Amino acid sequence: MTEAQTACATTETPVAAPAAPRWRVADVIALYELPFNDLLFRAQQTHREHFDANAIQLSTLLSIKTGGCEEDCGYCSQSAHHDTGLKAEKLMEVDAVLAAARTAKENGATRFCMGAAWRNPKDRHIEPIKEMIRGVKDMGLETCVTLGMLEEHQAKALAEAGLDYYNHNLDTSPEFYGQIISTRTYQDRLDTLERVRDAGINVCCGGIIGMGESRRERAGLIAQLANMNPYPESVPINNLVAIEGTPLENAQALDPFEFVRTIAVARITMPKAMVRLSAGREQLDDAMQALCFLAGANSMFYGDVLLTTGNPRAEADRKLLARLGMWASEASQLSA
């Protein structure tokens, strides 16, 4: 090597090492293990830095295509692999979906989510779903859809329709994932989320707890979410609803305090995200739901049916917020 080559070699810019994760699993476990009052105090402090602590966004979720899904998710009543007595239905007509959205708005919801039980949508499905998105947005509602895995061109088409959020949950930690589903890999989920992000759509991504996972595995889910760059704008936390006919029908109920802890840890690790109380909320009494709000939850799914599981009645939800001195708010009004 010549002197010039040697000089050139020694002055080359070294390749940067990959950035360290913002949250190690051990750090998330340490949050979980804080005394309950200390954890909630820290979560509430974080929450108040970014949001109006007494404002809750009300969301409604409609199943626009029910049952017959090719996936084998162990928790899901809509899987064709499980005998849950759920009849598979075709994609709803656009007018029927828009009628449901109008009802949701009349009942106080400001966010309307549409879910389809597919492994992935066919291209022929995208156009009617774009019509639904446009129609719901014309009502002044925030839009979210969950349709399974997406190809790049499908994500772009949804973005062109003005979709606000795309939901695609990780479900659980990478380590526990194989015990819940075998028909779709963890990387498949991450790839869809990347396509959604690249299309310019806000990411809605969370998981389900109470499926038999350990606290470490719950922490693994939160760390995975919090270390996304950027982390999701919307993080739904689901409490398993054990449905007869699914592999998890006999799952042991999660300690409600562990659910509250998970909400608090999600708030601390993803301070600017909307943390949403999702499926399984009916398993929490009013006092536990109030603790979830204290822990930093600032959205809840609202209405009588959440996909194919029950959800507290809308009137009961309104009364609960009134008793707590809290109020329903537009998404744009939630920030402090």
Curated annotation (Swiss-Prot):
The lineage of its organism: Bacteria, Pseudomonadati, Pseudomonadota, Betaproteobacteria, Burkholderiales. This is Biotin synthase. Keywords: 2Fe-2S, 4Fe-4S, Biotin biosynthesis, Iron, Iron-sulfur, Metal-binding, S-adenosyl-L-methionine, Transferase. Its EC number is 2.8.1.6. Pathway: Cofactor biosynthesis; biotin biosynthesis; biotin from 7,8-diaminononanoate: step 2/2. [2Fe-2S] cluster binds at C113, C144, C204, R276. SMART domains: BATS, Elp3. The keyword Iron applies. GO terms for molecular function: 2 iron, 2 sulfur cluster binding; 4 iron, 4 sulfur cluster binding; biotin synthase activity; iron ion binding. Residues 54-281 form the Radical SAM core domain. Binds 1 [4Fe-4S] cluster. The cluster is coordinated with 3 cysteines and an exchangeable S-adenosyl-L-methionine. Binds 1 [2Fe-2S] cluster. The cluster is coordinated with 3 cysteines and 1 arginine. One of its GO terms (biological process) is biotin biosynthetic process. The keyword RNA-binding does not apply. It catalyses: (4R,5S)-dethiobiotin + (sulfur carrier)-SH + 2 reduced [2Fe-2S]-[ferredoxin] + 2 S-adenosyl-L-methionine = (sulfur carrier)-H + biotin + 2 5'-deoxyadenosine + 2 L-methionine + 2 oxidized [2Fe-2S]-[ferredoxin]. [4Fe-4S] cluster binds at C69, C73, C76. Catalyzes the conversion of dethiobiotin (DTB) to biotin by the insertion of a sulfur atom into dethiobiotin via a radical-based mechanism. InterPro entries: Aldolase_TIM (IPR013785), BATS_dom (IPR010722), Biotin_synth/BioAB (IPR002684), Biotin_synthase (IPR024177), Elp3/MiaA/NifB-like_rSAM (IPR006638), rSAM (IPR007197). Belongs to the radical SAM superfamily. Biotin synthase family. Its cofactor is [4Fe-4S] cluster; [2Fe-2S] cluster. It comes from Burkholderia pseudomallei (strain K96243). Homodimer. PROSITE patterns: RADICAL_SAM (PS51918).
